[in-house]
């Protein structure tokens, strides 16, 4: 029988040459959620996710994957169940787009017709038309297209969990936003479990179903974006969020208005514009030129109401922060 928890950390510690990298780390990661670990460089985030696929062994404590201790798995069997996305996604240059995406399913001897359908569906989902992109080689792709294909390759394997270690930190803001949307789109369709590592609280709030804040190898707080923002239990957690508020107010994603409580329940009867949580305050102001209210589609795919008054209040509060 499947349990709600896919990965469980029990009092994990990791030392390097008598120096503690991780201390007393305990956490349950639920099936089907995007769990984001956020913290500064050196806080232990990458060490934690490397323990999941056996690249790093804990000094103390136990890790359970799908109900079994990690150490009891054959390493190859374990890693076939785990996808890994790093900053630099390298496609095989002598393989077409379709061959790159189909790599792991082919290694698993999945039926070819099923693989072909999967490849076409995934390409379609990320706005890469199969008949145009299937047979293209990596050197015929733009940088953003290569990133999308690399991410599809990981999800095509249908792993039980996908580990994403600062995958977008080296990208320009436009590419970064596009790939964040891609992750949310794929997650909505496949309901994969994702553990995402970042140092950017904005990114954490945008992507995470739950967020874990780390500092100096310790887990300070775990909660939903709303819980982290509205009820920080540590000065460092509060400071981390406040730093994410220092940017151009018009470039703020609408999901931040959700986590801060500026959105309201939808009325029974609503006819008007709809924006996605990945859109910005600037886009909301543009939409308000012809409307008094907006529907905002949140990450869980529910609609919430944004009024003109609440948007003005947010901008005022933001500038006075």
Give the predicted meaning of each segment:
Residues 61-69, 78:
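Conserved ABC transporter NBD signature motif
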Residues 53:
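Helix-to-loop junction immediately C-terminal to a conserved catalytic motif
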Residues 113-132:
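Conserved ABC ATPase "signature" region
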Residues 216-217:
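Conserved ABC ATPase "signature" C-loop
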Residues 137-141, 145:
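Conserved ABC ATPase signature
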Residues 222-223, 231:
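ABC ATPase "signature
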Residues 158:
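Conserved catalytic motifs of ABC-family nucleotide-binding domains
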């Amino acid at each position: 029988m499947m349990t709600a928890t896919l990965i469980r950390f029990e009092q994990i510690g990791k030392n390097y040459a008598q120096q503690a990298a991780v201390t007393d780390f305990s956490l349950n990661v639920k099936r089907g959620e995007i769990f984001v670990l956020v913290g500064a460089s050196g806080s232990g985030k990458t060490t934690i996710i490397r323990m999941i696929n056996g690249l790093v062994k804990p000094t103390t404590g136990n890790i359970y994957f799908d109900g079994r201790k990690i150490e009891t798995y054959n390493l190859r069997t374990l890693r076939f169940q785990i996808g890994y996305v790093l900053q630099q996604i390298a496609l095989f240059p002598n393989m077409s787009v379709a061959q790159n995406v189909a790599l792991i399913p082919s290694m698993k001897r999945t039926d070819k017709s099923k693989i072909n359908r999967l490849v076409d569906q995934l390409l379609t989902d990320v706005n890469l038309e199969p008949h145009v992109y299937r047979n293209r080689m990596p050197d015929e792709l733009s940088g953003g297209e290569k990133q999308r294909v690399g991410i599809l390759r990981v999800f095509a394997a249908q792993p039980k969990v996908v580990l994403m270690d600062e995958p977008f930190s080296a990208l320009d803001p436009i590419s970064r936003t596009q790939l964040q949307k891609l992750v949310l789109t794929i997650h909505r369709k496949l309901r994969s479990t994702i553990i995402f590592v970042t140092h950017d609280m904005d990114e954490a709030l945008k992507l995470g179903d739950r967020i874990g804040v780390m500092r100096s190898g310790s887990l300070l707080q775990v909660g939903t974006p709303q819980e982290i923002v509205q009820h920080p239990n540590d000065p460092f957690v509060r400071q981390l969020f406040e730093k994410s508020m220092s940017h151009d107010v018009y470039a703020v994603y609408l999901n931040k208005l959700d986590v801060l409580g500026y959105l309201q329940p939808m009325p029974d009867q609503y006819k008007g514009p709809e924006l996605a949580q990945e859109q910005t305050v600037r886009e909301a102001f543009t939409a308000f030129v012809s409307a008094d209210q907006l529907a905002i589609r949140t990450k869980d795919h529910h609609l919430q109401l944004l009024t003109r008054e609440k948007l003005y209040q947010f901008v005022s509060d933001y500038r006075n922060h």
